Regions:
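N-terminal amphipathic/hydrophobic targeting modules at extreme N-termini
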Residues: 2-6
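Acidic, low-complexity central loop/insert segments
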Residues: 19-20, 26-29, 72-182, 250
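Short, low-order "capping/linker" segments at domain edges
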Residues: 119-132, 181-192, 302-312
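Short, conserved active-site entrance elements at the starts or edges of catalytic domains
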Residues: 169, 175-201, 238
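Short glycine-/aliphatic-rich beta-strand segments at the starts of folded cytosolic domains
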Residues: 22-41, 116-124, 227-237
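Acidic, proline/glycine-enriched N-terminal capping motif
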Residues: 7-69, 75-81
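Glycine-rich, small/acidic residue-mixed loop/short-helix segments
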Residues: 198, 203-206, 220-312
């Protein structure tokens, strides 16, 4: 990847814009004549819709339909070096490379873990442009803002060019949690959660009309039957933040597990039918002794506990 990619988004108002380097994110590059076709046969998203300017949220699944790793797929234009770049959890990048190489067979692709060279900067509450890296809008939900794939030592320069204040990664976590966006390894367990449980179907991470991908049969069946009983959902609390991993209880009955928590908001993997029963019976939900309340996010289209059908 060139040091300064000439790729930007439409400039806009940047008052109050913040940016944070995300140390938990890594980068895997897939390049070659067959790169798009190769990944499109594996990942949940339609990579035919990825362009230098439009990234896609996706995941690699087990044959049983569970998430091995989720990622944001961005593209570099041919004049800037070409290739598809996967913005993924850094701890899982080596495993992702290993898995992709397993499926490579005779495909004309080169797969590289570039996490030692490249990192990911998130920028939100504004828009801007920078030539210090590959800029793409976060495709998961409005409000998440931009992401910039770049050498980490250029983060301060990229933030300045964006017109953003460079802040700690913890500030981005507060923003992510406030928007109700799940984070793998904290809000759901990799290799144990289905895409629906991690809200990938709600956040543009699964294209049900594309061709085959690994685990498609299970995921499509869950979609058509509406059989996802568990989901990561936003919650609110007024007291001290509940600890991640504590059970969420409705009386003596466990209804889920607590995940992220920051600044009065959190995320929890909840069994929706049991939550609906608790709400109907006016039984409070408790996470480690802390009362929590489910809060419906703007992006949710699935039937919310207590509602009769999904939002139109």
């Amino acid at each position: 990847m060139p040091q300064r990619l000439r790729f930007s988004v439409i400039s806009g108002k940047t008052i109050g814009m913040k940016a944070a380097l995300l140390p938990d994110r890594g980068v895997v590059k897939v390049a070659g004549d067959d790169a798009r076709k190769f990944l499109n046969g594996l990942l949940t998203a339609d990579l035919g819709r990825v362009t230098p300017g439009s990234a896609r949220f996706a995941a690699l699944l087990t044959p049983q339909g569970k998430i091995i790793v989720d990622c944001i797929v961005a593209e570099v234009a041919p004049e800037d070096g070409a290739g598809l770049f996967l913005d993924c959890p850094r701890a899982l990048a080596p495993n992702l490379v290993e898995r992709l190489n397993f499926y490579k067979l005779r495909a004309k692709v080169v797969i590289e873990d570039l996490s030692e060279m490249l990192g990911v900067l998130a920028a939100w509450d504004g828009q801007g442009s920078t030539d210090y890296g590959l800029v793409y809008e976060d495709p998961r939900a409005a409000g998440l803002g931009l992401r910039v794939m770049l050498p980490p030592h250029l983060a301060d320069k990229a933030a300045a060019e964006l017109g953003a204040e460079l802040v700690e990664a913890s500030a981005y976590e507060v923003h992510r949690v406030a928007l109700g966006i799940p984070r793998g390894g904290l809000d759901f367990v990799y290799s144990d959660a289905f895409p629906h449980e991690a809200d990938m179907d709600q956040l543009g991470g699964v294209d049900f009309d594309k061709g085959c991908f690994i685990g498609q049969e299970v995921v499509s069946r869950m979609e058509h039957r509406g059989s996802a009983r568990n989901r990561v959902v936003p919650v609110a609390y007024d007291a001290f933040a509940p600890e991640a991993g504590v059970p969420v209880m409705a009386g003596e009955r466990q209804v889920g597990t607590m995940g992220s928590a920051a600044a009065g908001r959190g995320l929890a993997m909840l069994r929706l039918d049991r939550v609906a029963d608790a709400l109907a019976a006016d039984v409070a939900l408790m996470a480690g002794g802390v009362p929590i309340r489910p809060v419906k996010p703007g992006w949710a289209r699935f039937p919310w506990p207590g509602e009769t059908k999904a939002a139109e």
